[in-house]
Regions:
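Catalytic core of nucleotide-sugar-dependent glycosyltransferases
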Residues: 1-195
Length: 195
């Protein structure tokens, strides 16, 4: 967190692709080069069981603009004022954490509900973009770089941030007493408490 404290507001990209996502070495290189080539400061979470897949060349390249860590307190980092973008697999928990922190997203979905969530992030909520994979399903560094630049510096960057803040506010309202989530929990408890 000390490193993050020294960064400008909304200048850092957090990259975390979930507990179960598994990239091979070539795909990690593509992801890493896309992150580094974006020119943005970043924190990249690479699980300790995958760190051996990173080339020494990529590690050195990453040292110029960012940090590679094996773990971070994701919600705490997302809530930090320096975070401007979250590159994620679009798992539901990670997406909700970004929503409640008002952070725009770059989605790289893999399976299950992730492609649907990424579509919502991009098309319905307007708070980010999806990385388009190659025809063979491979990640390409140029596309990762393009998406990060689009969210951080593109013509629609203010729209992504404004929409992220709008959804953050809606999430907070839903959780407050009398909000939709609060009401549904009360209804659920009332319905099933007698069983």
């Amino acid at each position: 967190m000390d490193w993050l404290e020294k960064q400008s507001i909304s200048s850092v990209v957090l990259v975390s692709y979930g507990t179960f996502s598994n990239y091979d070495a070539a795909q990690l290189e593509e992801l890493g080069n896309g992150i580094c080539n974006s020119g943005k400061s970043f924190i990249w979470v690479v699980r300790s069981n995958e760190a051996h897949k990173l080339s020494e060349e990529l590690r050195k390249k990453c040292e110029k603009n960012g940090l590679i860590v094996s773990w971070c307190p994701q919600l705490e980092v997302l809530a930090h004022k320096a975070i401007g973008c979250f590159v994620t697999h679009c798992g539901w928990n990670s997406t909700l954490e970004a929503v409640v922190c008002g952070v725009p997203l770059v989605g790289i979905p893999h399976w299950a509900d992730q492609p649907t969530i990424a579509k919502y992030v991009e098309s319905a909520w307007g708070m980010g973009v999806r990385v388009r994979k190659s025809e063979s399903g491979s990640l390409r560094s140029a596309e990762v770089e393009r998406c990060i630049r689009e969210v951080m510096d593109g013509e629609r960057k203010d729209d992504y941030k404004r929409n992220a803040m709008k959804w953050m506010q809606k999430a907070k309202e839903a959780m407050q007493e009398g909000g939709s989530s609060d009401k549904h929990i009360v209804e659920f408890a009332a319905k099933y408490s007698s069983i």
